[in-house]
């Protein structure tokens, strides 16, 4: 079934809502852990759910290459394959193709590239992306687009955005032709150029989608540019449709996105950083492999209710990290994912209670930082 989005409340620019799917309800603003290959690295689905996650992100490109559509169909779909009972959003593969760099060739038809797994020549286009995502059983399907690189000239960004709009129409047409009962999101492109973002928003809303993502950010541009584009773009998006900021980010990036009207986020940062021993806490980041933690018998974060913080000390986590024990990476991941979900839960509660600005001030004060300004000067 198509998602139903209800905007329940706004407070100081932040939006409090609910996404309703056949497979469950997602409270927004929401953070989606990334399960690239059909797994959030090192976690069982039950462990991911216990952190507070209600929706996951799967990777169309990587799941197409391994295990492939036929294996997926043998199981039913991605939910059955990985035993995740909740909703799943899948990206279209556009960003992964963008990341291949010189090994890919982009044409009007689609993208030619070499399979990074075995070197075979393969081709992906809007129609193929829609077919793969239908086989995955994605609750939210993303259109196939080109992620505009940074830096890009105005002409380069314009050409890329216009092609993404044409691919958006092709994605919409093929999605409808397949009679896919789920939801399709458009992706706003245009680089750091406000006039191009305007054209992209206009074109996408004329086509019509179930939600709208802001893409092409967090690809190397200064943080000020990301904030500026969000402040310019979000007010133009339909108020009654969910807004998704792709591939972002640090905890403070989630807060800044919510301040600018974003409802949904995803990022590999909590899981990737966990495996590298960088752990998010109320005051900032702990690097658990630093020697000072060797004799520290306190938990990572006294405010945290995760399994790791309730049962283990920094000293033990430091020991596991220094020994390269798999358990260390797992415990770190549980903590980081729970920290992100706690941030989102606190954001939602503060909006419910009409005190979002106070939450933002407290969030930055705990890290010893000033609240970044909103507006063109930010």
UniProtKB/Swiss-Prot annotation:
Residues involved in substrate binding: 91-95, 145, 189, 216
Q: Which reaction does it catalyse?
A: 7-aminomethyl-7-carbaguanine + guanosine(34) in tRNA = 7-aminomethyl-7-carbaguanosine(34) in tRNA + guanine
Q: Name one GO molecular function term.
A: tRNA-guanosine(34) queuine transglycosylase activity
Would the keyword ATP-binding be found if you checked this record's keyword annotation? Answer: no
Give the cofactor note text: Binds 1 zinc ion per subunit.
Q: Pfam families given for it?
A: TGT (PF01702)
Which residues are recorded as binding Zn(2+)? 304, 306, 309, 335
List the active-site residues: 91, 266
Enzyme Commission no: 2.4.2.29
Task: Enumerate the cofactors the protein uses.
Answer: Zn(2+)
Q: Which GO terms describe its cellular component?
A: cytosol
The Swiss-Prot or TrEMBL record describes its family as follows:
Belongs to the queuine tRNA-ribosyltransferase family.
For this protein, the record's NCBIfam families field holds:
Q_tRNA_tgt (TIGR00430), tgt_general (TIGR00449)
| UniProt subunit comment | Homodimer. Within each dimer, one monomer is responsible for RNA recognition and catalysis, while the other monomer binds to the replacement base PreQ1.
Q: What does this protein do?
A: Catalyzes the base-exchange of a guanine (G) residue with the queuine precursor 7-aminomethyl-7-deazaguanine (PreQ1) at position 34 (anticodon wobble position) in tRNAs with GU(N) anticodons (tRNA-Asp, -Asn, -His and -Tyr). Catalysis occurs through a double-displacement mechanism. The nucleophile active site attacks the C1' of nucleotide 34 to detach the guanine base from the RNA, forming a covalent enzyme-RNA intermediate. The proton acceptor active site deprotonates the incoming PreQ1, allowing a nucleophilic attack on the C1' of the ribose to form the product.
This chain belongs to which protein, by name? Queuine tRNA-ribosyltransferase
Q: Which organism is it from?
A: Vibrio atlanticus (strain LGP32)
């Amino acid at each position: 079934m198509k998602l139903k989005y209800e905007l329940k409340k706004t407070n100081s620019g932040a939006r409090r809502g609910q996404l309703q799917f056949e497979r469950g309800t997602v409270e927004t603003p929401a953070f989606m852990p990334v399960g690239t290959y059909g797994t959030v690295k090192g976690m069982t689905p039950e462990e991911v759910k216990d952190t507070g996650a209600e929706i996951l992100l799967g990777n169309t490109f990587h799941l197409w290459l391994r295990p492939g559509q036929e294996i997926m169909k043998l199981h039913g779909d991605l939910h059955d394959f990985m035993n995740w009972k909740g909703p799943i959003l899948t990206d279209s593969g556009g960003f992964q193709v963008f990341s291949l760099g010189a090994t890919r060739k982009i044409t009007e038809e689609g993208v030619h590239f070499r399979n990074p797994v075995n070197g075979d020549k393969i081709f992906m286009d809007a129609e193929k992306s829609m077919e793969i995502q239908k086989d995955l059983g994605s609750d939210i399907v993303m259109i196939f687009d080109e992620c505009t690189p940074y830096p890009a000239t105005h002409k380069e960004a314009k050409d890329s955005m216009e092609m993404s709009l044409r691919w958006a129409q092709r994605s919409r047409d093929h999605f409808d032709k397949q009679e896919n009962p789920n939801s399709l999101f458009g992706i706003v492109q245009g680089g750091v150029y406000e006039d191009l973002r305007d054209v992209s928003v206009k074109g996408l809303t004329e086509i019509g989608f179930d939600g709208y993502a802001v893409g092409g950010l967090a690809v190397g541009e200064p943080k000020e540019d990301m904030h500026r584009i969000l402040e310019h773009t979000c007010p133009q998006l339909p108020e009654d449709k969910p807004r998704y900021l792709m591939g972002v980010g640090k905890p403070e990036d989630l807060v800044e996105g919510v301040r600018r009207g974003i409802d949904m986020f995803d990022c590999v940062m909590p899981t990737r950083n966990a495996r590298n021993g960088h752990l998010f806490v109320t005051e900032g980041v702990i690097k658990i492999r630093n020697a000072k933690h060797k004799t520290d018998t306190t938990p990572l974060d006294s405010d945290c209710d995760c399994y790791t913080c309730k049962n283990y000390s920094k000293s033990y986590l430091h020991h596991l990290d220094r020994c390269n024990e798999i358990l260390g990476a797992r415990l770190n991941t549980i903590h980081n994912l729970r920290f992100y979900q706690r941030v989102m839960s606190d954001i939602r509660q503060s909006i419910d209670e009409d005190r979002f600005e106070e939450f933002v001030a407290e969030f930055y004060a705990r890290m010893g930082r000033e609240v970044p300004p909103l507006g063109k000067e930010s």
